[in-house]
From Swiss-Prot:
It catalyses: (R)-4'-phosphopantetheine + ATP + H(+) = 3'-dephospho-CoA + diphosphate. The gene is coaD. SUPFAM superfamilies: Nucleotidylyl transferase. It is an enzyme of class 2 (transferase). This is Phosphopantetheine adenylyltransferase.
Length: 170
């Protein structure tokens, strides 16, 4: 990295929807780098609950307090190739469990083979949000008391979006 070159990182995921775990990762990563790109990776084989535009809007809402964070979308590319395209020197990944670690460690080696100039940074969220996932949040919607329950796991702007979407069911 050249002197005076901004330290740019990419934090990618499906963010369907963004959770407090994602927000924790964003908060930590933005404090470590000059610029953080929060990128929605489009997986055509994965059925999403929210459109790409909705997910990007939610991410913009929950990251607006961080001037060094921007959102983006990438599709049909390896994350490491996307990182290279946006001149990021780092990929940020979250480790919630031993199985996450094993998977991410393997991916880090593959990424290093494809783009040795890009480093992977692993962050471990605190125990109280380590098990929070978008899939878990979506699974909690519906039963009696779900609105109070999911409020514990998603940022306020995301909570309001989910409530508005399901208001006809209450």
């Amino acid at each position: 990295m050249l002197p005076n070159t901004p330290r740019r990182a990419v934090y990618a995921g499906s963010f369907d929807p963004p959770t407090l775990g994602h927000l924790w990762m964003i908060r930590q990563a933005q404090s470590m780098f000059d610029e953080l790109i929060v990128a929605i990776g489009i997986n055509p084989d994965k059925r999403s609950t929210y459109t790409v535009a909705e997910r990007q809007d939610m991410l913009c809402d929950i990251t607006k307090m961080f001037p060094n964070v921007r959102t983006d979308v990438f599709e049909n590319r390896f994350l490491v190739h996307y990182a290279r395209e946006v001149d990021a020197g780092f990929i940020v990944r979250g480790i919630r469990s031993a199985s996450d670690y094993e998977y991410e460690r393997s991916m880090r080696h593959i990424n290093s083979d494809l783009a040795p100039e890009i480093s992977t940074v692993f962050l471990m969220p605190p125990r109280e949000i380590a098990e929070v996932s978008s899939t878990m949040v979506k699974g909690l919607v519906g039963p009696e008391g779900w609105t109070e329950t999911i409020h514990r796991y998603v940022p306020q702007a995301v909570y309001e979006k989910i409530l508005a979407e399901h208001q006809h069911e209450n």
